[in-house]
Amino acid sequence: SLSHRFAQNGLAPEFAFKIWSPFLEQLDSHVVEMWKAGQWKDFCGMLPEYASKGHGEGFMHDTAMMLGALGWSEYDGKADIVTPYFGASGTGQINAVFPVTPVTGRDIPKAVASGADGYTPVSRRI
Protein backbone atom coordinates (compact mmCIF):
# COMPACT_ATOMS: atom_id res chain seq x y z
CA SER A 1 0.00 0.00 0.00
CA LEU A 2 1.09 3.52 -0.75
CA SER A 3 -1.33 6.34 0.09
CA HIS A 4 -4.18 4.91 2.08
CA ARG A 5 -7.07 7.38 2.14
CA PHE A 6 -10.14 5.17 1.99
CA ALA A 7 -13.25 6.43 0.25
CA GLN A 8 -15.81 7.76 2.73
CA ASN A 9 -18.98 5.83 3.54
CA GLY A 10 -21.39 5.93 0.64
CA LEU A 11 -18.62 6.65 -1.89
CA ALA A 12 -16.96 3.25 -1.91
CA PRO A 13 -18.56 2.07 -5.18
CA GLU A 14 -17.46 5.25 -6.96
CA PHE A 15 -13.86 4.78 -5.76
CA ALA A 16 -13.65 1.00 -6.11
CA PHE A 17 -10.86 1.34 -8.70
CA LYS A 18 -9.78 4.96 -8.19
CA ILE A 19 -7.39 6.93 -5.99
CA TRP A 20 -8.94 9.29 -3.43
CA SER A 21 -7.27 12.45 -4.73
CA PRO A 22 -5.06 13.63 -7.60
CA PHE A 23 -2.57 14.93 -5.01
CA LEU A 24 -2.14 11.49 -3.44
CA GLU A 25 -1.87 9.86 -6.85
CA GLN A 26 0.93 12.26 -7.85
CA LEU A 27 2.67 11.78 -4.50
CA ASP A 28 2.53 8.00 -4.90
CA SER A 29 3.76 8.24 -8.49
CA HIS A 30 6.83 10.16 -7.32
CA VAL A 31 7.48 7.61 -4.56
CA VAL A 32 7.30 4.71 -7.04
CA GLU A 33 9.85 6.50 -9.25
CA MET A 34 12.12 6.95 -6.21
CA TRP A 35 11.85 3.23 -5.45
CA LYS A 36 12.64 2.29 -9.06
CA ALA A 37 15.69 4.59 -9.01
CA GLY A 38 16.90 3.32 -5.62
CA GLN A 39 16.64 6.73 -3.91
CA TRP A 40 16.40 5.21 -0.43
CA LYS A 41 18.23 7.92 1.51
CA ASP A 42 15.77 10.53 0.24
CA PHE A 43 12.78 8.24 0.69
CA CYS A 44 13.72 7.22 4.24
CA GLY A 45 14.16 10.90 5.13
CA MET A 46 10.66 11.75 3.94
CA LEU A 47 8.92 8.58 5.15
CA PRO A 48 7.43 10.03 8.38
CA GLU A 49 5.89 12.99 6.54
CA TYR A 50 4.79 10.79 3.63
CA ALA A 51 3.11 8.44 6.11
CA SER A 52 1.27 11.34 7.71
CA LYS A 53 0.28 13.40 4.70
CA GLY A 54 -0.24 10.39 2.45
CA HIS A 55 -2.52 8.68 4.99
CA GLY A 56 -0.11 5.74 5.14
CA GLU A 57 -1.73 2.57 6.44
CA GLY A 58 -0.60 2.08 10.04
CA PHE A 59 1.76 5.05 9.55
CA MET A 60 3.57 2.98 6.87
CA HIS A 61 4.77 0.48 9.48
CA ASP A 62 5.00 -2.30 6.89
CA THR A 63 7.23 -0.16 4.64
CA ALA A 64 9.37 0.91 7.61
CA MET A 65 9.85 -2.70 8.75
CA MET A 66 10.72 -3.85 5.24
CA LEU A 67 13.28 -1.05 4.85
CA GLY A 68 14.73 -1.89 8.27
CA ALA A 69 15.23 -5.49 7.13
CA LEU A 70 16.80 -4.29 3.86
CA GLY A 71 19.20 -1.84 5.54
CA TRP A 72 17.21 1.44 5.64
CA SER A 73 18.94 4.23 3.74
CA GLU A 74 22.02 2.05 3.15
CA TYR A 75 19.91 -0.23 0.91
CA ASP A 76 21.06 0.03 -2.70
CA GLY A 77 18.55 -2.17 -4.50
CA LYS A 78 15.97 -0.91 -6.97
CA ALA A 79 12.32 -1.91 -6.87
CA ASP A 80 11.15 -4.19 -9.65
CA ILE A 81 7.55 -3.21 -10.38
CA VAL A 82 5.39 -6.30 -10.92
CA THR A 83 2.03 -4.62 -11.48
CA PRO A 84 1.37 -1.01 -12.44
CA TYR A 85 0.12 1.37 -9.75
CA PHE A 86 -3.63 0.99 -9.26
CA GLY A 87 -6.43 2.35 -7.12
CA ALA A 88 -8.56 0.28 -4.76
CA SER A 89 -11.30 1.84 -2.61
CA GLY A 90 -9.49 5.19 -2.79
CA THR A 91 -6.08 3.78 -1.82
CA GLY A 92 -2.93 3.54 -3.94
CA GLN A 93 -1.62 0.02 -4.47
CA ILE A 94 1.34 -1.61 -6.20
CA ASN A 95 3.10 -4.95 -6.27
CA ALA A 96 6.88 -4.73 -6.33
CA VAL A 97 9.91 -6.89 -5.61
CA PHE A 98 12.74 -5.46 -3.50
CA PRO A 99 15.88 -7.56 -4.07
CA VAL A 100 17.95 -8.30 -0.98
CA THR A 101 21.45 -6.84 -1.19
CA PRO A 102 24.37 -7.00 1.29
CA VAL A 103 24.41 -4.17 3.85
CA THR A 104 26.23 -3.48 7.12
CA GLY A 105 23.15 -2.25 8.98
CA ARG A 106 24.90 0.98 9.99
CA ASP A 107 22.05 3.21 8.77
CA ILE A 108 19.18 1.38 10.47
CA PRO A 109 17.78 3.77 13.09
CA LYS A 110 17.61 2.67 16.70
CA ALA A 111 14.12 1.65 17.80
CA VAL A 112 12.63 4.39 19.95
CA ALA A 113 8.95 3.47 20.13
CA SER A 114 9.59 1.07 23.01
CA GLY A 115 12.16 3.20 24.83
CA ALA A 116 11.30 4.45 28.30
CA ASP A 117 13.70 7.41 28.24
CA GLY A 118 10.98 9.98 27.74
CA TYR A 119 8.54 11.24 25.17
CA THR A 120 9.40 11.33 21.49
CA PRO A 121 7.10 12.58 18.73
CA VAL A 122 5.46 9.92 16.58
CA SER A 123 7.23 11.30 13.50
CA ARG A 124 10.59 10.26 14.99
CA ARG A 125 9.52 6.70 15.78
CA ILE A 126 9.96 5.40 12.25
Walk through the language-model features, giving the residues of each:
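Flexible, D/E/H-enriched segments
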Residues: 9-126
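Catalytic metal-binding/acid-base residues of hydrolase active sites
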Residues: 3
